A protein has these predicted regions:
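RNA pseudouridine synthases
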Residues: 1-226
């Protein structure tokens, strides 16, 4: 784990793929939270559930790499939480997906919720917009580069539902390479060194009024695509 930036309010980290953000059921290895507590013990009382995820305002899946912001005090935690809730934080991701997209840019939106078939997965009803704001999801995407069997996308989620990007790209027929949970049978046996989803940048106005922009370079696996 790499610290990109720190001040009295925030810690910005570059999370590697394979590192869980916080402990969960069956998690025995060290997590991002464990490393943060060693270096920044003051965050142990910060957050909604500080005994499990101190300072954590947003999360990345274990298999996802990239930039994350962590709150260093409760006031900043509440401030950042409000920014995320009101979509005032700009997030961009890189995603390598199977196939060639007909539409080179577009959006996916709809209502998300827990799958009725598998409680461990999320599902999407595309195009369904209800009054339940907590379920609404929206993702913009654009093709950056095309390969023989894959496409590299820049993805901008406008909401923050669990597994949102993974579910949305799967829903349009282009699952993320290396994603074992949201894929099709035809791709399940195709080996990949990782799940190719990377949080590449984060931008927002801090509690001090400063405008911040943080980015994480794509991991080496993204440079080995053919």
């Amino acid at each position: 784990m790499k610290i990109i930036f720190e001040n009295q309010d925030i810690i910005v980290v570059d999370k590697p793929a394979g590192l869980a953000v916080h402990p969960g059921v069956g998690t025995e290895e060290k997590t991002l939270v464990d490393f943060l507590l060693e270096k920044f013990p003051e965050i142990k009382t910060v957050g909604d559930v500080p005994e499990i995820r101190p300072g954590i305002v947003h999360r990345l899946d274990k298999e996802t790499s990239g930039v994350m912001v962590v709150a260093r005090n409760q006031k900043t935690f509440e401030y950042l939480k409000d920014l995320f809730k009101n979509r005032k934080i700009e997030k961009k991701y890189l995603a390598l997906v199977f196939g060639t997209l007909k539409e080179k840019e577009g959006k996916v939106e709809g209502e998300m919720g827990r799958s009725k078939k598998d409680f461990r997965k999320q599902s999407l009803v595309r195009g369904k917009i209800s009054v339940r704001k907590e379920r609404y999801s929206l993702t913009h995407y654009a093709v950056k580069k095309e390969f023989e069997k894959y496409s590299l996308l820049e993805v901008s989620p406008k909401t923050g539902r669990m597994h949102q990007i993974r579910v949305h790209l799967h829903s349009i027929g282009h699952p993320i390479v290396g994603d074992k949970k949201y894929t099709f049978k035809a791709f399940k046996n195709i080996s990949a060194p990782r799940m190719f989803l990377h949080a590449s940048s984060l931008s927002f106005t801090g509690p001090d009024g400063e405008k911040y922009f943080f980015e994480s370079e794509p991991p080496k696996e993204f440079g080995e695509i053919k």
